[in-house]
């Protein structure tokens, strides 16, 4: 039998979110709005297991991200490898980045090699986006 392209496991999603301390109405809404509900609940569980954030914060980040599994991995990797004073900041940055796993690698690598604090590495890596140079055509006159 072929595996389904999506998971429709809304009961497990709700059960995991309730066990994580999410209010029943919030758990029901988050699972109901999700295309892949267990990705949301797994993300929340992963974030809560790795960090000291509020369950509601984890739910907001996980349910509003295109890659909830990577958000949990990002938070987990940063907490495993670095001293973290502000878990909420780590969660916020892992949620804000487009590629959470790559972002975590940047944060850990910069912190370890440049001797930055975790907070400095979070800020440096989130600001290190792609900046194209010498884009043609230029709208500046070449007089």
Task: Give the location of each predicted region.
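General marker for long, soluble alpha-helical cores
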Residues: 2-143
């Amino acid at each position: 039998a072929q595996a389904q392209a999506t998971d429709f496991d809304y009961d497990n999603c709700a059960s995991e979110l309730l066990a994580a301390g999410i209010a029943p109405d919030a758990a029901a809404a988050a699972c109901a709005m999700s295309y892949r509900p267990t990705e949301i609940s797994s993300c929340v569980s992963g974030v809560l297991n790795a960090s000291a954030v509020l369950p509601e914060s984890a739910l907001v980040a996980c349910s509003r991200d295109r890659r909830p599994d990577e958000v949990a991995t990002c938070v987990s990797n940063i907490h495993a490898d670095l001293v973290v004073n502000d878990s909420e900041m780590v969660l916020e940055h892992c949620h804000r980045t487009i590629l959470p796993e790559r972002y975590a690698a940047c944060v850990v690598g910069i912190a370890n090699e440049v001797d930055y604090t975790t907070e400095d590495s979070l800020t440096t890596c989130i600001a290190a986006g792609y900046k194209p140079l010498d884009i043609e055509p230029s709208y500046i006159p070449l007089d």
